[in-house]
Each structure stands twice: as structure tokens, then as C-alpha cells.
Amino acid sequence: MSLADLTKTNIDEQFSSVALENNRRSAECKRSPGTGDFSRNSNASAKSVDYSRSQCSCGSLSSQYDYSEDFLCDCSEKAINRNYLKQPVVKEKEKKKYNVSKISQSKGQKEISVGKKHTWNASLFNSQIHMIAQRRDAMAHRILSARLHKIKGLKNELADMHHKLEAILTENQFLKQLQLRHLKAIGKYENSQNNLPQIMAKHQNEVKNLRQLLRKSQEKERTVSRKLRETDSQLLKTKDTLQALQKLSEDKNLAEREELTHKLSIITTKMEANDKKIQSLEKQLRLNSRAFSRQLAIETRKTLAAQTATKTLQVEVKHLQQKLKEKDRELEIKNIYSHRILKNLHDTEDYPKVSSTKSVQADRKSLPFTSMRHQGTQKSDVAPLTTKGKKATGNMDRKEKSTEINREIPHCVNKLPKQEDSKTKYEDLSREEKHLEVQVLLENTGRQKDKKEDQEKKTIFVKEEQELPPKIIEVIHPERESTQEDVLVREKFKRSMQRNGMDDTPDKCTAPYTKGPLRQRRHYSFTEATENLHHGLPASGGPANAGNTKYSHSTSKHLSNREEMELEHSDSGYEPSFGKSSRIKAKDTTFRDKKSSLMEELFGSGYVLKTDQSSPGVAKGSEEPLQSKESHPLPPSQASASNAFGDSKVTVVNSIKPSSPTEGKRKIII
């Protein structure tokens, strides 16, 4: 308010100074009317100077107190308005004075004419002053209004700034409150993080305590429930006893106590006897079940053994079938030309038909052997001479074992114990089981030995086949078979027959395999044209084929010598009673006659001459053909030619693991 008062006083002083100057100038004009223009100019200049001064003073005041104008209030505005109202009042007074002076001058015109002139000049001067004053007043009014307008704008800005300040202050207060709250929350969070392990430990302890309380409460509930059940059961029992006692008390037809006690004792004895019987029956059932389980186990073992035996037999059969197929293929590959010639010869009527089936070949090839019931004794005594005979005996022995097992199963089933004599029969069964187990062990050991021997023989057979050169058939003279081997074979055969008790009926258990006298091999000599045709050469052969013809003649000679030696050996060898040797001996002469006649018909008299030339070479001994065979092996073409009119196949049989060291490779040519 002090600044506003200062501004009011300054404005009043300015207006008062202006009014005083006007009065003084008017007085001066009255005093010096002659100098009107100069005074006017001077007054105007003074007034202009004063106005400039007033402006300067106002500017200085505004420059000095510019910061205080922003803080003017309504009271200062009211004071300024009052000053503006006072100014027209002063002007009206001046006008009245001017009018009064005019009136006074008009009254004194009559007296003083000079005075009239001065009044006229003064009135003009006053009118000019009045115009200048009005102009100044308008300028001042405009300046003041602009200044007031500025002041009002500044006041409005001040008010806006005050409002903004107030809003900012409130916002600051709210933000400070939020900051305090955030700080408090952050402090709590940090404290909670620091106190987390403690809180967790407290929580875990509380959980443990609660669980312990739960367990205790559950245990208490269980005990209470048990007690309740027990009490309920006791109550029911007591109720039942009460009802029974009430019934007894109500019954009037009761017997005496002695009779009742006697009846009770009898009933108790009967109950005890029944309990004992039940216990004894249970024991018997247990024993019977054990016996049955053991018997079932034994039978299952036997069945498993039989199944394994059948599987092994099936595998062996398949293996043998494969071997037979392979041998058939090899023979077909070797004897291509012989098959073609045989087809042509079978068509003729005079030629005796030859059946070259596998069964006939097996009968011809097989040497005498026996099929034994127990494999252990057979292996220790007899070593078979051929692979097929060995496998056939093994098959027969395994079949006999399977039949024995099938016979023993019903025998054991019939020996099941009854309820009366369970203990004694159980002991007998245990003994029988032990005996059967021993037999099974012996059979297993025998089978293992069989397998080992079979493997050894197979390895030896493979080695011997590998040692032999391909496409060469070695023929070893049968004189290498010593008489000792024949004696050993006879003794072993007799022992086996005595052990098995099969002397009376050998046809039932043993297969009648016989070694009859070997058939004579048919050897034919051909002309050069036919031999060349067999070899695939042209019929008209030159001197180059002479060596082959000589070679064929020599081989035919050796073969004829060998056949004669075989016939001699077969006459001196062992021949069983159930063989067919006598029939073959009777047919030898007729067969030779037929052969000679047939060859004459086919090839003419040249073949007979060649056979006559080759006959004296037989007396040279049995060693020459062996040496010639070893030094000159048969070529495959010559072998096929020699087999053309004989048997269709040449089979080579190696003895597997011979019984004596002198026994070597044995080959039978059919």
C-alpha cells in the first residue's frame, strides 16, 4: 500500500503544479498584455517543456517505481479517478473567472478603451491556452489510460502467476507426500527382505507345530474310536449273554447240570477229534501237492528234453537233405553225358533196368552196423563206418529214448500216492526221482559226447575233402582193409546183440543193413569215333587222339583187375546170414554172358578183342593198378565215358574216425 500512496502523491503534485503554472501564466498575461505572441510562444514552449518534464518525471517515476506498479490495488485506481474528477471542477472555476473578467471588462469599456483591448487579447490567449490544455489533457488522458491498461494486464498476469504458484505449491505438497509414502514402502520392503529368512523359519516352525498337533489329535481320535468299538462289542456280548440267560431262566424243562456237563464234554472231544483230522488231511494235501509239483517238474524237464532232441533231429535232417541235394547237383554236373546215354539205353529191351534212387544207393553204400538202445555203450564200443549209418543209428536211439520217456510218464503217474500210505509212497517216489535224474544226467552226458564226436568227425571229413584235389576220384584197393578189422566188427556186433537181448528178434529193433559182395563194375572199350563224340570232338580223330585211347585202355585194364580182386575179397570176407550174396554169385555168370553179347551187338567184335588183350594183364599183381591210379588220375571225360554203360553215379564215402589206425580212406564204387 505504501507504493500506491506514493504514486497517488506524485500524481496530485503533478496536477497541482500544472494548475499553479496555468494561474501564474494567466496572471502574467494580465500584467503584460502587449507581449501576447511572445508570451504565447513562451508559454507554449514552457508548457511543452513542462509537459516534457512531466513526462520525464512520469518516466522517471515509472522507471524508478516500475516494480511497484505491479502491486497496485483498487484503492489506487479510486484515487486516480477522483483526481480526474477534480480536474474538470478546476477548469470550470477558471472559466467562471474568465467570464467574470469579461463581464468586468465589458462594464469598464465605456471608461477605458485600452482595457478593452487587453481583455480581448487575454480572451484569445486564454482560448488558446484552453485549447492547448485540452490537447494536453487528452494526451495525458490517453497516456494514463494506456498506462492503466498496461497495469491491468500486468495485474491479470500477476493473478495468473499467483494461481499457477498456488497449483504448483499444491502439487509439490502432494509429491512430497507421495515421496514420503514411497520411502516408507521402500523401507518396509527392505526390512521385509532382510527379515524373510526369519519369517520363513517362524512359518516352518508354526507348520511343524500344527502338524504335530494334527497327528496327536488324529491319534487321540483313533484311540477314542477303538475304545468306542470295544465298548460297543462288549455291550453286544453282554446283551447276548443277558438274552441267553433270560431264556435259560425262563425255560422250565431244563435238564440237570451233570447231564449238561456230560454232553458238553462229549461235544468238545468230538470237536478236538475233528480238528486233528482236519490237520492231518491238510498235511496230506501239502505232501500230495509237493509230490505232484515235483512230478510235474520232472515231466516238464522230460518234455523239454524231448523237444530239444526233436529240434536237433529236425536240424540234422535238414542238414542231411541239403547235403544230399548238393551231392545230387555235383553228380548231375559230372555225369551229364552218362545221363544222356542212359536215357537211350533204358529204351532198349535187352538192357536190364537200373534203379538209381537214394534209398538203393544208401543200401549199397552202407556197411554192417547195429542200432543200440543206450548211446553211451554204443559210442564206447562201436565206431560206425559211414556217415549215413552213424546218423541213422543216432536217430533210432533218440526215437527209442523218446518212447522210453513216454512209457515212463504213465508209469510215474500210476505211482501217485494215496491218502492212506502217503509217507511210504513219497519215499519210493523220491528214490525213483533220483534214479530218473541219474538216468537223465547219463543221457545228457551221452548226448554231449555224441555232439562232440560228430563235430570232430565233421571237421576231419572237411579236412579230408579239402586235401583231395578237385574233379579226381581216388580208388583205393580193398586189400588195405585188414582181417583184424573184420574180426573186431564181428565181436562188437555180437556184444551189442548180447547186451540188448535182441538175438532172438533182430528184425524188430535193428535195421538189417548188410554188406553184400560188391557189384562188378562194367567196363567197356569204345572206338575212337565214339570216344571223340563223348569228348565233344569230331568223329574222325587223328594221331593226336592216340594217347587218349591208350590211356583209356590202361584204365579199363586196371579197373578189370580191381574188380577181380574185389570179387576174391568178397568171397573171403564176412557175410551175415541175412544177406543176399548167394543170389548175386549165381547171377554173375549170366550177367557176364549178357554183357558180352550186348557189347558185340552194339560195338562189334573189336570190343571183344580189346577185352581179350586186356585179360593177361591181370596176372601182374594188385600193386600195378594202384600205382597207375596214383600216377595217372582219371580225367573227368574218361570217367564219364567209363560210367556211361555202368551205374549212373560214383559215390565216395570217407570213413569218419576209423576204429583202427590201419583203416584209411574207404571208397565204394557202385
From Swiss-Prot:
A Pfam short name: Lebercilin
Positions of the UniProt region annotated as Disordered: 24-44, 351-402, 495-520, 533-594, 606-647
GO process annotations (BP): intraciliary transport
InterPro entries: Lebercilin-like, Lebercilin_dom
The keyword Coiled coil is assigned to this record: yes
Gene Ontology cellular component terms for the protein in this record: axoneme
Biased composition range(s): Polar residues: 368-380, 546-558, 637-647
Coiled-coil residue windows: 148-259, 305-336, 420-440
Keyword field: Coiled coil
Keyword Glycoprotein in record: no
Biased composition (Basic and acidic residues): 560-572, 585-594, 621-632
PANTHER family per UniProt: C21ORF13-RELATED, LEBERCILIN-LIKE PROTEIN
Family: Belongs to the LCA5 family.
Protein name: Lebercilin-like protein
Organism of provenance: Papio anubis (Olive baboon)
Gene coding for it: LCA5L
